[in-house]
Amino acid sequence: MLHYRTYEISPETPWVTFIHGAGGSSSVWFKQIREFRKKHNVLLVDLRGHGQSARGMWKKGDTFADISREVIEVLDEVGIKETHVIGMSLGTIVAQTMADNFPGRVKSLILGGAIIRFDIRTKLLLLVGRAVKRFVPYMLLYRLFAYIIMPRKEHEESRMAFVNEAKKVYQKEFIRWFSLTKLINPYLTRLQISTTAIPTLFLMGEEDYLFIPPIEEVVRKNKGFEFIKIEKSGHVCNIDQPEVFNKLAIDYIAKIEQKNAVIPIG
């Protein structure tokens, strides 16, 4: 089972589950925990091969569905029937896959630095990465990707946070995660269609230039999706602008909880 950590107020308090991206760990949410645990039960998960979760869990043919199922196993272990899910970067794909395969377990999705389609630039970058992944030290590739995705000086803290976490991931694990990106665009397109019934908020840094255009397009087509740009922020907006990220996410969860509340009659 995946390594996890919980902060629980009471059984009646809504749960919020945090899912980090590839190369990260649950520690990337350090600027969210204090604020969220005030009024929410919090579940932090280390995805396979990351943080304190076991390595070598991969089987041939594993997909995002298998990874999302492992998160559901943690929910079962803790006794969480429903949860709001907050994902970051590639973790947003895991979050959306959970919503697709287990819609009754996901109250809402809050997707930061969301990846819903790779454009020609990111596809070319991934193609080069796949071609050299077994010959080039993975940290060199990861640093390169980090600088391309988070190029500005003001992104330095978030960039270094992800690079430092990635150092703890073995090369074989990195290669496995990297391989999941092959032929992923059709899968991502299907996810945007199949999860429209789940309330979804996209939180994107205004400087997340690689991934914003597809978000704008999908939000125009789906009235149930909401999209907010966070100023002075890049791809990892929960670290670049934590106060803004936290307020927007907490307000959204409160709105969903209010909609779901049962009002007694009489």
Q: Each PLM stretch: what is its role?
A:
Residues 1-17, 38-41, 76, 80-81, ...:
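Alpha/beta-hydrolase fold catalytic core
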Residues 5-56:
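Conserved HGGG/HGGXW glycine-rich cap/lid loop of the alpha/beta-hydrolase fold
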Residues 34, 43-86, 247:
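Active-site loop/oxyanion-hole signature of alpha/beta-hydrolase fold enzymes
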Residues 120-122, 139-194:
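Conserved alpha/beta-hydrolase catalytic His-Asp/Glu region
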Residues 209-215:
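Conserved alpha/beta-hydrolase "acid-adjacent" motif
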Residues 233-246:
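Catalytic histidine-centered segment of alpha/beta-hydrolase-like enzymes
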Residues 100-101, 106-136:
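Flexible "cap/lid" loop of the alpha/beta hydrolase fold
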Residues 196, 202-204:
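Short beta-strand/loop motif that positions the catalytic acidic residue
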